[in-house]
């Protein structure tokens, strides 16, 4: 079997030389892939990519056999391309998304995960159409970067907690090769999908889109019971999704070539990723957190 691509969200900051620090953090967890934000997730503040140590990042990754094609960027949370109510806000977030795409192209990271957004006070179907409209616009700026729309928990007015929403979007975007899906195991569970029946869930996916549309997986346990629509991540093996179910996801041969990214909570301000990665690869829950 191919090597398991397993990593986590890592920080990127000035004191650790930006992207060089991101690679070093991933290496410290024995991760062979990772995900970053290119700036604060709740802000439009961005450091010019010329200052992010891009070349040094790629040199360091090469020495540790980490492939840039496996890396993931998460788009800022403030982007809401589903907004069908306020066109000025919608245009602002589309423009900001274009800037993020350009940054991914410059950093040479090919997958940009994006929360599809919320319909707020608008109409659900109108919001899905706004997403399609936005994706059609930004596709003109995508050269090597693909957007992975993330499965959501259905909290509040979030769209895309149903696989059918992804089918509708993927069927109707113009440049179908530039858009895919990011599966989030916590969100799927909270949205009502029973991932302990993984084979059945994959069949449900196949009824809506082909499995090769899955560009990455966010691997998280959940603090809440199924169908809770809460979106509260738990550490691996400590939640309602369960360790064995998450091991099944990690070792699924259909997804062997895509990155599984942990976004689990810190324990007493300490990242849990090294232990979680080790446990998952060993298929053994050691209860060390």
UniProtKB/Swiss-Prot annotation:
PROSITE patterns: AP_NUCLEASE_F2_1 (PS00729), AP_NUCLEASE_F2_2 (PS00730), AP_NUCLEASE_F2_4 (PS51432)
Gene3D superfamilies attached to this UniProt entry: Divalent-metal-dependent TIM barrel enzymes (3.20.20.150)
GO BP annotations listed: base-excision repair
Keywords: DNA damage, DNA repair, Endonuclease, Hydrolase, Metal-binding, Nuclease, Zinc
GO MF term (any one): DNA-(apurinic or apyrimidinic site) endonuclease activity
Residue positions binding Zn(2+) 2: 150, 184, 218, 263
Pfam families, per database record: AP_endonuc_2
Residues annotated as binding Zn(2+) 1: 74, 115, 150
Cofactor info, note text: Binds 3 Zn(2+) ions.
Catalytic activity field: Endonucleolytic cleavage to 5'-phosphooligonucleotide end-products
EC number: 3.1.21.2
Needed cofactors: Zn(2+)
Chain positions recorded as Zn(2+) 3 binding sites: 187, 231, 233
Family annotation (NCBIfam families): nfo, PRK01060.1-1
Similarity field: Belongs to the AP endonuclease 2 family.
Function: Endonuclease IV plays a role in DNA repair. It cleaves phosphodiester bonds at apurinic or apyrimidinic (AP) sites, generating a 3'-hydroxyl group and a 5'-terminal sugar phosphate.
Protein name per UniProt: Probable endonuclease 4
Gene source species: Mycoplasma mycoides subsp. mycoides SC (strain CCUG 32753 / NCTC 10114 / PG1)
Gene: nfo
């Amino acid at each position: 079997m191919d090597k398991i691509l397993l990593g986590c969200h890592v920080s990127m900051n000035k004191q650790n030389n930006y992207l060089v620090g991101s690679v070093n953090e991933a290496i410290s967890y024995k991760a062979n892939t990772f995900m970053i934000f290119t700036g604060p997730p709740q802000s439009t503040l961005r450091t010019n990519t010329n200052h992010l140590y891009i070349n040094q990042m790629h040199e360091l990754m090469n020495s540790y056999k980490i492939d840039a094609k496996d890396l993931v960027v998460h788009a800022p949370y403030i982007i809401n391309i589903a907004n069908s109510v306020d066109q000025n806000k919608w245009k602002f977030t589309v423009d900001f998304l274009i800037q993020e795409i350009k940054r991914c192209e410059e950093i040479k990271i090919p997958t940009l995960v994006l929360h599809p957004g919320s319909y707020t006070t608008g109409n659900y179907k109108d919001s899905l159409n706004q997403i399609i409209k936005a994706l059609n616009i930004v596709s003109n700026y995508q050269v090597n970067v693909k957007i992975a729309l993330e499965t959501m928990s259905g909290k509040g007015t979030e769209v895309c907690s149903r696989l059918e929403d992804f089918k509708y979007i993927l069927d109707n975007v113009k440049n179908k090769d530039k858009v895919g899906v990011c599966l989030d195991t916590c969100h799927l569970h909270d949205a009502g999908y029973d991932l302990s029946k993984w084979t059945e869930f994959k069949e449900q996916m196949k009824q809506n889109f082909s499995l090769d549309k899955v560009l990455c997986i966010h691997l998280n346990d959940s603090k809440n019971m199924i169908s809770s629509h809460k979106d509260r991540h738990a550490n691996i093996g400590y939640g309602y999704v369960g360790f064995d179910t998450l091991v099944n996801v990690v070792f699924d041969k259909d997804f062997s070539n895509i990155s599984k990214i942990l976004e689990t909570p810190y324990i007493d301000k300490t990242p849990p990723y090294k232990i979680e990665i080790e446990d998952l690869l060993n298929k053994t829950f050691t209860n060390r957190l």
